[in-house]
Amino acid sequence: ALRIHWASGRDYEGRAAEIIKDNLRAVGIDVTVLVLDRPSFIDKVFRNWDFDLANQLFTTGPDPSISVTPRYHTNQIKKAPFVNGMGYTNPEVDKLFDAEFTEVDRTKRAAMWRNIQQHLMADLPALPLFEVPPIHAASAKYRDIVMGSQGYIESRENAYMVR
């Protein structure tokens, strides 16, 4: 049976795993869904590469060089969390990653990223299934809470409570 792993605490990943299981069963493929605590998931998927499929939330942040490049660049094939655990390699994509990293012209960089996206969607080292919309909420008692693209991991160092 094909194994699909997901980390507890992210129920949307579990629901997606069950949908995948049902859809693959319909075409004769047996799937076992395995839910793991987050540390065990990271060990099994990223450190040990002991998985067939894994549901993993990827975020791109304000600059894709920071989060997308490590997930797909050949030089990031490592047994470590949140890098290229798929073992994906494409020399043309690597060249684009290397070039866009040093490109200062935003228009040229954007064109390079469109090209990278086209390659990744053709090669499918990871299959985007859904997007989790960011929801940010804070009590009106607080001021200067950063609500940016990174959501809950944004800095709160300047936040304060009005009394």
Map each language-model feature to its residues.
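Detector for C-terminal structural segments
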Residues: 8-22, 38-163
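Short, well-ordered beta-strand elements
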Residues: 1-9, 31-34, 52
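Short, well-structured beta-strand/strand-turn elements
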Residues: 25-40
